[in-house]
From Swiss-Prot:
Noted disease: Osteoarthritis 3: A degenerative disease of the joints characterized by degradation of the hyaline articular cartilage and remodeling of the subchondral bone with sclerosis. Clinical symptoms include pain and joint stiffness often leading to significant disability and joint replacement. Intervertebral disc disease: A common musculo-skeletal disorder caused by degeneration of intervertebral disks of the lumbar spine. It results in low-back pain and unilateral leg pain.
Organism: Homo sapiens
Key words, A-Z: Biomineralization, Calcium, Disulfide bond, Extracellular matrix, Glycoprotein, Leucine-rich repeat, Repeat, Secreted, Signal
Lineage: Eukaryota, Metazoa, Chordata, Craniata, Vertebrata
Name this protein carries in UniProt: Asporin
GO annotation, cellular component aspect: cell projection; collagen-containing extracellular matrix; extracellular matrix; extracellular space
Intervals holding LRR repeats: 103-124, 127-148, 151-173, 174-193, 196-219, 242-263, 266-287, 290-312, 313-334, 335-357, 358-380
Region (Disordered) location: 35-59
Pfam families (UniProt xref): LRR_8, LRRNT
Subcellular compartments: Secreted, Extracellular space, Extracellular matrix
Chain positions carrying an annotated carbohydrate: 55, 282
Amino acid sequence: MKEYVLLLFLALCSAKPFFSPSHIALKNMMLKDMEDTDDDDDDDDDDDDDDEDNSLFPTREPRSHFFPFDLFPMCPFGCQCYSRVVHCSDLGLTSVPTNIPFDTRMLDLQNNKIKEIKENDFKGLTSLYGLILNNNKLTKIHPKAFLTTKKLRRLYLSHNQLSEIPLNLPKSLAELRIHENKVKKIQKDTFKGMNALHVLEMSANPLDNNGIEPGAFEGVTVFHIRIAEAKLTSVPKGLPPTLLELHLDYNKISTVELEDFKRYKELQRLGLGNNKITDIENGSLANIPRVREIHLENNKLKKIPSGLPELKYLQIIFLHSNSIARVGVNDFCPTVPKMKKSLYSAISLFNNPVKYWEMQPATFRCVLSRMSVQLGNFGM
Protein backbone atom coordinates (compact mmCIF):
# COMPACT_ATOMS: atom_id res chain seq x y z
CA MET A 1 0.00 0.00 0.00
CA LYS A 2 2.85 2.39 0.87
CA GLU A 3 4.48 1.70 -2.46
CA TYR A 4 1.22 2.48 -4.28
CA VAL A 5 0.80 5.81 -2.48
CA LEU A 6 4.40 6.73 -3.27
CA LEU A 7 3.94 5.99 -6.97
CA LEU A 8 0.74 8.04 -7.03
CA PHE A 9 2.55 10.96 -5.40
CA LEU A 10 5.34 10.78 -7.97
CA ALA A 11 2.82 10.78 -10.81
CA LEU A 12 1.08 13.85 -9.42
CA CYS A 13 4.37 15.68 -8.99
CA SER A 14 5.26 14.98 -12.62
CA ALA A 15 2.00 16.37 -13.98
CA LYS A 16 2.24 19.56 -16.01
CA PRO A 17 0.58 22.70 -14.58
CA PHE A 18 -2.63 23.91 -16.17
CA PHE A 19 -2.30 26.98 -18.38
CA SER A 20 -5.32 29.16 -19.07
CA PRO A 21 -5.92 30.17 -22.70
CA SER A 22 -4.73 33.70 -21.99
CA HIS A 23 -1.40 32.39 -20.73
CA ILE A 24 -0.93 30.24 -23.82
CA ALA A 25 -1.69 33.24 -26.04
CA LEU A 26 0.83 35.39 -24.19
CA LYS A 27 3.44 32.64 -24.37
CA ASN A 28 3.05 32.29 -28.12
CA MET A 29 3.09 36.05 -28.56
CA MET A 30 6.54 36.41 -27.06
CA LEU A 31 7.97 33.06 -28.13
CA LYS A 32 9.77 34.09 -31.30
CA ASP A 33 11.44 37.20 -29.95
CA MET A 34 12.48 35.46 -26.76
CA GLU A 35 14.05 32.58 -28.65
CA ASP A 36 16.06 35.08 -30.71
CA THR A 37 17.27 36.94 -27.61
CA ASP A 38 20.70 36.03 -26.26
CA ASP A 39 20.54 34.34 -22.91
CA ASP A 40 24.22 34.25 -22.02
CA ASP A 41 23.64 35.21 -18.40
CA ASP A 42 21.45 32.19 -17.66
CA ASP A 43 23.48 30.01 -15.29
CA ASP A 44 21.21 27.05 -15.94
CA ASP A 45 22.04 26.81 -19.64
CA ASP A 46 24.41 24.01 -20.62
CA ASP A 47 26.78 24.60 -23.52
CA ASP A 48 26.21 21.04 -24.65
CA ASP A 49 22.43 21.44 -24.98
CA ASP A 50 20.97 21.82 -28.43
CA ASP A 51 19.00 24.90 -29.58
CA GLU A 52 15.71 23.34 -28.61
CA ASP A 53 16.77 22.94 -24.99
CA ASN A 54 18.05 26.54 -24.86
CA SER A 55 14.79 28.09 -26.02
CA LEU A 56 12.59 29.78 -23.44
CA PHE A 57 9.65 27.50 -24.20
CA PRO A 58 11.11 24.13 -25.26
CA THR A 59 8.90 21.89 -27.30
CA ARG A 60 9.81 18.97 -25.08
CA GLU A 61 10.19 18.59 -21.34
CA PRO A 62 13.51 19.70 -19.77
CA ARG A 63 15.96 16.91 -19.13
CA SER A 64 15.94 15.58 -15.59
CA HIS A 65 16.81 12.27 -14.06
CA PHE A 66 13.84 12.45 -11.72
CA PHE A 67 11.18 15.04 -12.62
CA PRO A 68 10.42 17.23 -15.68
CA PHE A 69 10.55 20.40 -13.58
CA ASP A 70 11.63 21.61 -10.15
CA LEU A 71 9.32 20.28 -7.46
CA PHE A 72 9.70 23.33 -5.23
CA PRO A 73 10.21 26.47 -7.36
CA MET A 74 10.00 29.89 -5.72
CA CYS A 75 6.64 31.26 -6.86
CA PRO A 76 4.28 33.94 -5.51
CA PHE A 77 1.25 32.53 -3.71
CA GLY A 78 -1.60 31.74 -6.10
CA CYS A 79 0.52 32.24 -9.23
CA GLN A 80 1.76 29.70 -11.76
CA CYS A 81 5.47 29.57 -12.51
CA TYR A 82 6.96 27.60 -15.36
CA SER A 83 9.84 28.07 -17.80
CA ARG A 84 10.68 31.47 -16.31
CA VAL A 85 7.13 32.71 -16.86
CA VAL A 86 5.19 33.93 -13.81
CA HIS A 87 1.46 33.93 -14.43
CA CYS A 88 -0.48 35.97 -11.81
CA SER A 89 -3.51 37.23 -13.73
CA ASP A 90 -7.12 37.29 -12.48
CA LEU A 91 -6.22 36.93 -8.81
CA GLY A 92 -7.66 40.17 -7.43
CA LEU A 93 -4.18 41.39 -6.48
CA THR A 94 -3.92 44.95 -5.11
CA SER A 95 -0.12 45.10 -5.33
CA VAL A 96 2.74 43.40 -7.14
CA PRO A 97 3.43 40.09 -5.35
CA THR A 98 6.71 39.33 -3.63
CA ASN A 99 8.92 36.27 -4.13
CA ILE A 100 9.02 36.66 -7.91
CA PRO A 101 11.93 34.50 -9.17
CA PHE A 102 14.90 36.66 -10.14
CA ASP A 103 15.31 34.84 -13.48
CA THR A 104 11.72 35.58 -14.60
CA ARG A 105 11.46 36.47 -18.29
CA MET A 106 7.73 37.18 -18.51
CA LEU A 107 5.50 38.48 -15.72
CA ASP A 108 1.73 38.46 -16.29
CA LEU A 109 -0.21 40.64 -13.83
CA GLN A 110 -3.20 41.55 -15.99
CA ASN A 111 -6.82 41.63 -14.80
CA ASN A 112 -6.06 42.55 -11.19
CA LYS A 113 -6.69 45.58 -8.97
CA ILE A 114 -3.19 47.02 -8.71
CA LYS A 115 -3.28 50.81 -8.24
CA GLU A 116 0.39 51.65 -7.92
CA ILE A 117 3.79 50.35 -9.00
CA LYS A 118 6.33 51.07 -6.26
CA GLU A 119 10.05 51.64 -6.54
CA ASN A 120 11.14 48.13 -5.55
CA ASP A 121 8.31 46.08 -7.07
CA PHE A 122 10.55 44.78 -9.88
CA LYS A 123 13.89 45.10 -8.10
CA GLY A 124 16.30 42.35 -9.07
CA LEU A 125 14.33 41.20 -12.13
CA THR A 126 17.30 41.78 -14.40
CA SER A 127 16.19 39.16 -16.95
CA LEU A 128 12.62 40.44 -17.34
CA TYR A 129 11.64 40.53 -21.02
CA GLY A 130 7.87 41.05 -20.99
CA LEU A 131 5.63 42.73 -18.39
CA ILE A 132 1.84 42.64 -18.71
CA LEU A 133 -0.18 45.00 -16.51
CA ASN A 134 -3.30 45.39 -18.66
CA ASN A 135 -6.66 45.94 -17.03
CA ASN A 136 -5.65 47.03 -13.56
CA LYS A 137 -6.37 50.29 -11.73
CA LEU A 138 -2.95 51.89 -12.15
CA THR A 139 -2.72 55.61 -11.50
CA LYS A 140 0.95 55.88 -10.54
CA ILE A 141 4.24 54.25 -11.52
CA HIS A 142 7.33 55.19 -9.52
CA PRO A 143 10.05 56.88 -11.65
CA LYS A 144 12.59 54.28 -10.49
CA ALA A 145 10.35 51.24 -10.89
CA PHE A 146 12.20 50.02 -14.01
CA LEU A 147 15.70 50.86 -12.83
CA THR A 148 16.92 47.25 -12.81
CA THR A 149 14.82 45.87 -15.70
CA LYS A 150 17.42 46.69 -18.31
CA LYS A 151 16.33 43.86 -20.63
CA LEU A 152 12.63 44.69 -20.71
CA ARG A 153 11.38 44.63 -24.31
CA ARG A 154 7.59 44.53 -24.06
CA LEU A 155 5.52 46.61 -21.64
CA TYR A 156 1.71 46.43 -21.71
CA LEU A 157 -0.17 49.04 -19.65
CA SER A 158 -3.51 49.19 -21.47
CA HIS A 159 -6.86 49.66 -19.73
CA ASN A 160 -5.62 51.55 -16.69
CA GLN A 161 -5.95 55.10 -15.35
CA LEU A 162 -2.51 56.53 -16.07
CA SER A 163 -2.46 60.26 -16.84
CA GLU A 164 1.02 60.23 -18.36
CA ILE A 165 3.49 57.88 -19.99
CA PRO A 166 5.81 56.54 -17.24
CA LEU A 167 9.15 58.29 -16.85
CA ASN A 168 12.54 56.58 -17.12
CA LEU A 169 11.36 53.64 -19.17
CA PRO A 170 14.10 51.09 -20.00
CA LYS A 171 16.20 52.00 -23.02
CA SER A 172 15.80 48.38 -24.14
CA LEU A 173 12.02 48.73 -24.62
CA ALA A 174 10.86 47.77 -28.12
CA GLU A 175 7.08 47.74 -27.63
CA LEU A 176 4.90 49.97 -25.44
CA ARG A 177 1.13 49.54 -25.34
CA ILE A 178 -0.75 52.05 -23.20
CA HIS A 179 -4.17 51.88 -24.84
CA GLU A 180 -7.23 53.28 -23.06
CA ASN A 181 -5.74 55.34 -20.27
CA LYS A 182 -5.98 59.07 -19.50
CA VAL A 183 -2.82 60.29 -21.23
CA LYS A 184 -3.19 63.87 -22.50
CA LYS A 185 0.41 64.72 -23.26
CA ILE A 186 3.59 63.22 -24.73
CA GLN A 187 6.42 65.24 -23.20
CA LYS A 188 9.59 66.08 -25.07
CA ASP A 189 11.91 63.74 -23.16
CA THR A 190 9.47 60.86 -22.71
CA PHE A 191 11.28 58.59 -25.19
CA LYS A 192 14.75 60.10 -24.89
CA GLY A 193 17.44 57.52 -25.60
CA MET A 194 14.91 54.78 -26.39
CA ASN A 195 16.48 53.82 -29.70
CA ALA A 196 15.02 50.30 -29.58
CA LEU A 197 11.37 51.45 -29.41
CA HIS A 198 9.59 50.17 -32.53
CA VAL A 199 5.90 49.86 -31.57
CA LEU A 200 3.81 52.48 -29.76
CA GLU A 201 0.12 51.76 -29.20
CA MET A 202 -1.72 54.51 -27.32
CA SER A 203 -5.25 54.61 -28.71
CA ALA A 204 -8.28 55.66 -26.67
CA ASN A 205 -6.47 58.38 -24.75
CA PRO A 206 -7.68 62.02 -24.60
CA LEU A 207 -4.69 63.20 -26.65
CA ASP A 208 -4.97 66.15 -29.05
CA ASN A 209 -2.42 67.70 -31.41
CA ASN A 210 -1.21 70.20 -28.82
CA GLY A 211 -0.49 67.34 -26.44
CA ILE A 212 2.40 66.09 -28.59
CA GLU A 213 5.28 68.36 -27.62
CA PRO A 214 7.82 69.30 -30.33
CA GLY A 215 10.75 66.89 -30.26
CA ALA A 216 8.84 64.20 -28.37
CA PHE A 217 9.99 61.56 -30.89
CA GLU A 218 13.39 62.99 -31.67
CA GLY A 219 16.01 60.29 -32.17
CA VAL A 220 13.69 57.28 -31.92
CA THR A 221 13.09 54.77 -34.72
CA VAL A 222 9.47 53.82 -34.18
CA PHE A 223 7.97 51.77 -37.03
CA HIS A 224 4.38 51.42 -35.81
CA ILE A 225 2.25 54.10 -34.11
CA ARG A 226 -1.45 53.88 -33.33
CA ILE A 227 -3.21 56.94 -31.91
CA ALA A 228 -6.79 56.04 -32.75
CA GLU A 229 -9.89 57.03 -30.79
CA ALA A 230 -8.24 60.24 -29.59
CA LYS A 231 -8.90 63.96 -30.15
CA LEU A 232 -6.61 64.66 -33.09
CA THR A 233 -7.89 67.25 -35.58
CA SER A 234 -5.01 66.88 -38.05
CA VAL A 235 -2.22 64.48 -38.95
CA PRO A 236 0.62 64.96 -36.40
CA LYS A 237 3.73 66.34 -38.06
CA GLY A 238 6.36 65.51 -35.45
CA LEU A 239 6.25 61.72 -35.53
CA PRO A 240 9.36 59.66 -36.43
CA PRO A 241 10.34 59.62 -40.13
CA THR A 242 10.98 55.87 -39.82
CA LEU A 243 7.26 55.08 -39.61
CA LEU A 244 6.02 52.11 -41.61
CA GLU A 245 2.52 52.08 -40.11
CA LEU A 246 0.45 55.02 -38.89
CA HIS A 247 -3.07 54.45 -37.57
CA LEU A 248 -5.14 57.55 -36.77
CA ASP A 249 -8.63 56.07 -37.11
CA TYR A 250 -11.58 57.38 -35.10
CA ASN A 251 -10.30 60.91 -34.59
CA LYS A 252 -11.63 64.31 -35.69
CA ILE A 253 -9.38 64.94 -38.69
CA SER A 254 -11.19 66.99 -41.35
CA THR A 255 -8.46 67.76 -43.92
CA VAL A 256 -5.29 66.12 -45.18
CA GLU A 257 -2.88 68.88 -46.17
CA LEU A 258 -0.06 68.81 -48.67
CA GLU A 259 2.71 68.72 -46.06
CA ASP A 260 1.10 66.19 -43.71
CA PHE A 261 2.99 63.13 -45.00
CA LYS A 262 6.16 64.82 -46.20
CA ARG A 263 8.08 63.45 -43.21
CA TYR A 264 6.84 59.85 -43.59
CA LYS A 265 8.23 58.71 -46.92
CA GLU A 266 8.69 55.09 -45.80
CA LEU A 267 5.05 54.67 -44.75
CA GLN A 268 3.41 51.44 -45.95
CA ARG A 269 0.11 51.35 -44.04
CA LEU A 270 -2.05 54.40 -43.35
CA GLY A 271 -5.22 54.35 -41.28
CA LEU A 272 -7.51 57.40 -41.48
CA GLY A 273 -10.86 55.67 -41.32
CA ASN A 274 -13.77 56.99 -39.28
CA ASN A 275 -12.70 60.62 -39.24
CA LYS A 276 -14.39 63.70 -40.74
CA ILE A 277 -12.19 64.12 -43.80
CA THR A 278 -13.77 66.18 -46.56
CA ASP A 279 -10.67 66.97 -48.58
CA ILE A 280 -7.27 65.43 -49.37
CA GLU A 281 -5.12 68.08 -51.01
CA ASN A 282 -3.60 67.29 -54.39
CA GLY A 283 -0.09 65.90 -54.09
CA SER A 284 -0.33 64.94 -50.43
CA LEU A 285 -0.31 61.19 -51.17
CA ALA A 286 2.72 61.58 -53.44
CA ASN A 287 4.80 61.97 -50.27
CA ILE A 288 4.20 58.31 -49.34
CA PRO A 289 5.29 56.51 -52.54
CA ARG A 290 5.76 53.13 -50.81
CA VAL A 291 2.32 52.92 -49.24
CA ARG A 292 0.55 49.58 -49.73
CA GLU A 293 -2.64 50.04 -47.73
CA ILE A 294 -4.84 53.11 -47.12
CA HIS A 295 -7.98 53.25 -44.98
CA LEU A 296 -10.31 56.20 -45.69
CA GLU A 297 -13.65 54.56 -44.97
CA ASN A 298 -16.39 56.34 -43.03
CA ASN A 299 -15.35 59.88 -43.87
CA LYS A 300 -16.98 62.68 -45.88
CA LEU A 301 -15.05 62.51 -49.14
CA LYS A 302 -16.94 63.57 -52.26
CA LYS A 303 -14.39 62.30 -54.77
CA ILE A 304 -11.61 59.75 -55.14
CA PRO A 305 -8.36 61.20 -53.74
CA SER A 306 -5.99 62.32 -56.47
CA GLY A 307 -2.65 60.62 -56.92
CA LEU A 308 -3.71 56.99 -56.44
CA PRO A 309 -2.51 55.88 -59.93
CA GLU A 310 1.00 57.10 -59.09
CA LEU A 311 1.22 54.92 -55.98
CA LYS A 312 3.00 51.96 -57.58
CA TYR A 313 2.76 49.62 -54.59
CA LEU A 314 -0.76 50.41 -53.40
CA GLN A 315 -2.75 47.19 -53.06
CA ILE A 316 -5.59 48.03 -50.66
CA ILE A 317 -7.75 51.16 -50.59
CA PHE A 318 -10.91 51.41 -48.47
CA LEU A 319 -13.27 54.22 -49.50
CA HIS A 320 -16.64 52.84 -48.46
CA SER A 321 -19.18 54.89 -46.52
CA ASN A 322 -18.23 58.27 -47.95
CA SER A 323 -20.09 60.73 -50.22
CA ILE A 324 -18.39 59.81 -53.50
CA ALA A 325 -20.76 60.44 -56.39
CA ARG A 326 -18.44 59.81 -59.34
CA VAL A 327 -15.53 57.48 -60.19
CA GLY A 328 -13.37 58.31 -63.19
CA VAL A 329 -11.79 55.73 -65.47
CA ASN A 330 -8.27 56.77 -64.38
CA ASP A 331 -8.91 57.36 -60.69
CA PHE A 332 -7.21 54.14 -59.57
CA CYS A 333 -4.99 52.84 -62.36
CA PRO A 334 -2.17 54.52 -64.30
CA THR A 335 -2.54 55.07 -68.03
CA VAL A 336 0.75 53.21 -68.55
CA PRO A 337 0.24 49.65 -67.19
CA LYS A 338 3.92 49.02 -66.45
CA MET A 339 3.96 51.82 -63.90
CA LYS A 340 1.95 49.71 -61.46
CA LYS A 341 4.26 47.37 -59.51
CA SER A 342 1.51 45.72 -57.44
CA LEU A 343 -2.07 45.06 -58.49
CA TYR A 344 -4.96 45.98 -56.23
CA SER A 345 -6.18 43.15 -54.02
CA ALA A 346 -8.99 45.18 -52.43
CA ILE A 347 -10.94 48.31 -53.41
CA SER A 348 -14.06 49.08 -51.38
CA LEU A 349 -16.61 51.62 -52.65
CA PHE A 350 -19.89 50.39 -51.21
CA ASN A 351 -22.23 52.74 -49.37
CA ASN A 352 -21.43 55.69 -51.63
CA PRO A 353 -23.86 57.64 -53.87
CA VAL A 354 -22.07 56.45 -57.04
CA LYS A 355 -23.90 53.68 -58.91
CA TYR A 356 -21.99 50.63 -60.01
CA TRP A 357 -23.40 50.77 -63.53
CA GLU A 358 -21.99 54.29 -63.93
CA MET A 359 -18.42 53.00 -63.61
CA GLN A 360 -16.58 51.86 -66.72
CA PRO A 361 -15.07 48.35 -66.53
CA ALA A 362 -11.66 49.79 -67.48
CA THR A 363 -11.67 51.72 -64.22
CA PHE A 364 -10.52 48.56 -62.45
CA ARG A 365 -8.08 47.26 -65.04
CA CYS A 366 -5.26 47.00 -62.49
CA VAL A 367 -6.96 44.75 -59.93
CA LEU A 368 -6.20 41.10 -59.29
CA SER A 369 -9.74 39.93 -59.97
CA ARG A 370 -13.31 41.15 -60.09
CA MET A 371 -13.80 39.97 -56.53
CA SER A 372 -11.20 42.53 -55.44
CA VAL A 373 -13.70 45.36 -55.97
CA GLN A 374 -16.56 45.71 -53.51
CA LEU A 375 -19.48 47.86 -54.67
CA GLY A 376 -22.06 46.80 -52.12
CA ASN A 377 -24.26 43.92 -53.22
CA PHE A 378 -22.67 43.94 -56.64
CA GLY A 379 -19.18 42.77 -57.59
CA MET A 380 -17.39 43.58 -60.82
